[in-house]
Amino acid sequence: MLSLLVWILTLSDTFSQGTQTRFSQEPADQTVVAGQRAVLPCVLLNYSGIVQWTKDGLALGMGQGLKAWPRYRVVGSADAGQYNLEITDAELSDDASYECQATEAALRSRRAKLTVLIPPEDTRIDGGPVILLQAGTPHNLTCRAFNAKPAATIIWFRDGTQQEGAVASTELLKDGKRETTVSQLLINPTDLDIGRVFTCRSMNEAIPSGKETSIELDVHHPPTVTLSIEPQTVQEGERVVFTCQATANPEILGYRWAKGGFLIEDAHESRYETNVDYSFFTEPVSCEVHNKVGSTNVSTLVNVHFAPRIVVDPKPTTTDIGSDVTLTCVWVGNPPLTLTWTKKDSNMVLSNSNQLLLKSVTQADAGTYTCRAIVPRIGVAEREVPLYVNGPPIISSEAVQYAVRGDGGKVECFIGSTPPPDRIAWAWKENFLEVGTLERYTVERTNSGSGVLSTLTINNVMEADFQTHYNCTAWNSFGPGTAIIQLEEREVLPVGIIAGATIGASILLIFFFIALVFFLYRRRKGSRKDVTLRKLDIKVETVNREPLTMHSDREDDTASVSTATRVMKAIYSSFKDDVDLKQDLRCDTIDTREEYEMKDPTNGYYNVRAHEDRPSSRAVLYADYRAPGPARFDGRPSSRLSHSSGYAQLNTYSRGPASDYGPEPTPPGPAAPAGTDTTSQLSYENYEKFNSHPFPGAAGYPTYRLGYPQAPPSGLERTPYEAYDPIGKYATATRFSYTSQHSDYGQRFQQRMQTHV
């Protein structure tokens, strides 16, 4: 019975649970992007009453259509217990907590949070789309993303490359739900950022791809300048061109040039040209370019090669014994110079730096030091600096001095050390004297820039003065200094010997100059003589052809005149400077003569009869056939081209007009030997200079030539000069005078040359 009761109770409880109202599906939290559709589910079991939705505790209404909320409605099948809330075009106002209620069953669902996401309304970079900046001035690029829910995240890009280091901040709007994000990116613009594009991208959950905006930079900057030199390395005094290349934004307004800080007035272009000196190595040349933003100044030094120049001159130094001394000497030169310190009259190098350090100096260190700078292949310069070392007096006079017996003598005591002596005293024999006169002795003191000189003057030097030692003692603040000086006698030569030697030397010098002039004259004269023909070994014999009747006593081989002439021209054609061929035309009564004078260029090498005797006259004269007439002396000097070397000699005639009487001609002397030389004279064409000794043409004198008489007159009467031997007497002694037997009176004078190889 009891068990049956338990079964009945259990069954009744199960039945009651099967018919109870409950939520089979409740609304849950949901997120939606603004503008999208959202559905909040609500499903009830075993309920057929009224269902309503609340928003943040506010009832939205009953039924499926919610007239107060046009975008809201309850959807689903009521028979199936579906009371879902649908929200279309979600807005920020829809962002709330929702609850489904079964009022008759007194049931409430759990609250569901609907979150509405809102993308940034706008993304903007302050100052865009083009931002003008100053180069070198830091600037913050600012990007703003407005009214986003949740707050937007901002990313920066520079020409597509993401940038780090931006700083972001958010600002909550008054609705308490949306936020504005501000991001700042710090940049330091340069002229290279001109045209650079910066992009700001903002994003949140509502728009994961994000929104972008970009700006472009326009950077104003002072001119960017490059200064160049051409050539880069020059010698002092050469020309250099400076070129100033510049870029700027905005445009360049002008150029200015300066050297060593001083403006160059006449330079206003981008190019400056000048001659450089050593100062361009130490004083820079600057180019300044300016625009509206500012100016840029660029400087440069020129690599000028120049000789050493002093920068710090060494100064004379005075110090005490035992002290340390530093001498300073600074030079500048290019290429880098070599510096040496030496002591005067010594080649030992003491230092190679700008400073010379001398430790614990003594008086021996006193003197002049030389600071020498050497720039290889450019130049050398030096400076001298004296060093004075204070100490006891040092007497630098000669230990032996000289004087002439009977004359005035001097004994000198010189102190060149520092400081100058306070006292100087002389002592000799029993005498002591500082200054003044004592008997024949006088002491004088003289101060000069190099030291102090004390002089002991002796009047009428005697033998005893040469036997005495002279003591010179000087004192200064450092102590005394002493020197012993010996006076010795100087031998003097008599004035007559000196004068005679001087005169003799002068005479010898004069004779030497005369001999030198004569030697040079003879050498110059000899150099103008013979010209050696350096040709083949050819022997040439010149044969004079004359009328047969005038030389009937001579016989020799003959040759064709035309052949000899051609050979002569062929051999002597290259020596036309040494062959003087002249033709004199002279009309005396009825005859016309041709005369030639020629210098033998072979110097007698081809003279095959040089051993024969020759007349003293070098002019070989030939008689021509002419009508009888009054004789006349025809004087002429020997030719300059007449030499003893065997030159061919041809006759010329004087053209001097007849005038007053003169002395009778002298017969020729005996024939001179072959080696005899006579004075060389010029070739003669006109001999008016012989007018001082003319012979009249109508005075009864026949015409004569030097050395040979004229043919007798037609009357066979001898003239006053017939005492001379016939012309044939000298025919064999005349050089190259070999007359053909076949010649006649009607033929003109010709020469014939025989050549032997």
UniProtKB/Swiss-Prot annotation:
Abundantly expressed in kidney. Specifically expressed in podocytes of kidney glomeruli. The modification Phosphoserine is found at S574. The modification Phosphotyrosine is found at Y605, Y606, Y622, Y625, Y724. A motif (Cell attachment site) lies at residues 405-407. Residues 521-757 are cytoplasmic. Disulfide bonds join C42-C100, C143-C200, C244-C287, C329-C371, C413-C472. GO terms for molecular function: cell adhesion molecule binding; myosin binding. It is found in: Cell membrane. The gene is KIRREL1. Phosphorylation probably regulates the interaction with NSH2. Phosphorylated at Tyr-605 and Tyr-606 by FYN, leading to GRB2 binding. Gene3D superfamilies: Immunoglobulins. GO terms for cellular component: cell-cell junction; dendritic shaft; perinuclear region of cytoplasm; plasma membrane. Interacts with TJP1/ZO-1 and with NPHS2/podocin (via the C-terminus). Interacts with NPHS1/nephrin (via the Ig-like domains); this interaction is dependent on KIRREL1 glycosylation. Homodimer (via the Ig-like domains). Interacts when tyrosine-phosphorylated with GRB2. Residues 21-115, 120-216, 223-299, 308-387, 392-488 form the Ig-like C2-type domain. It comes from Homo sapiens. Belongs to the immunoglobulin superfamily. CDD domains: Ig, IgI_2_KIRREL3-like, IgI_5_KIRREL3, TM_EGFR-like. Keywords: Cell membrane, Disease variant, Disulfide bond, Glycoprotein, Immunoglobulin domain, Membrane, Phosphoprotein, Repeat, Signal, Transmembrane, Transmembrane helix. This is Kin of IRRE-like protein 1. Residues 649-679 are annotated as: Disordered. Coiled coil: none annotated. It is a single-pass type I membrane protein. The chain crosses the membrane at residues 500-520. It comes from the Eukaryota. It is linked to Nephrotic syndrome 23: A form of nephrotic syndrome, a renal disease clinically characterized by severe proteinuria, resulting in complications such as hypoalbuminemia, hyperlipidemia and edema. Kidney biopsies show non-specific histologic changes such as focal segmental glomerulosclerosis and diffuse mesangial proliferation. Some affected individuals have an inherited steroid-resistant form that progresses to end-stage renal failure. NPHS23 is an autosomal recessive form characterized by onset of proteinuria in the first or second decade of life, and variable outcome. Residues 1-16 form the signal peptide. GO terms for biological process: cell-cell adhesion; cell-cell junction maintenance; glomerular filtration; positive regulation of actin filament polymerization; renal protein absorption.
